[in-house]
Curated annotation (Swiss-Prot):
This is Dysbindin domain-containing protein 2. One of its GO terms (biological process) is monoatomic ion homeostasis. Residues 106-131 have a biased composition (Low complexity). The modification Phosphothreonine is found at residue 137. The modification Phosphoserine is found at residues 119-120, 142. The lineage of its organism: Eukaryota, Metazoa, Chordata, Craniata, Vertebrata. InterPro entries: Dysbindin. It comes from Mus musculus (Mouse). It comes from the Eukaryota.
Length: 158
């Protein structure tokens, strides 16, 4: 080994002291270092780690939105309150601007109702038995389908 055991012992003690100092520096926090207050206030403005930006979320939301023309009377009857009097072509002062109104409606509800109406009767345990004569009735009716089911379709107020 080493011809001088004393020098080897001193080098080993020096390495042990350096290791001890290294771990003391890491494990003991320095009291003189303080985070600036601006760092704490910016946390709410930073995007969450690993998430997509809010701009991408807004674009995705807009792609899923369907515009409904409120100038179309059939579509407007669903969203506008009913009047007891006969429908007038224009109320005084309310619709002075003939601009087109539109309403944003998410398409996910319509897609869900179509999916449930197209599902097979065998997969739904509560579906009517085809031998009872109820096999041809849909489970859910979408807004676009016209059905005569006794006033379920919104119409003019009476």
């Amino acid at each position: 080994m080493d011809p001088n055991p004393r020098a080897a012992l001193e080098r080993q003690q020096l390495r042990l002291r350096e290791r001890q100092k290294f771990f003391e520096d890491i494990l003991q926090p320095e009291t003189e270092f303080v985070f600036p207050l601006s760092h704490l206030h910016l946390e709410s403005q930073r995007p969450p780690i690993g998430s997509i930006s809010s701009m991408e979320v807004n674009v995705d939301t807009l792609e899923q939105v369907e515009f409904i023309d409120l100038a179309d009377q059939d579509g407007a009857d669903v969203f506008l309150p009913c009047e007891e009097s006969s429908p007038a072509p224009q109320m005084s002062g309310v619709d002075d601007h003939p601009e087109e109104l539109s309403l944003l409606v998410p398409t996910s509800d319509r897609t869900t109702s179509r999916t449930s109406s197209l599902s097979s009767d065998s997969s739904n345990l509560r579906s009517p038995n085809p031998s009872d004569g109820g096999g041809d009735t849909p489970l859910a009716q979408s807004d676009e389908e016209d059905g005569d089911d006794g006033g379920a379709e919104p119409g003019p107020c009476s």
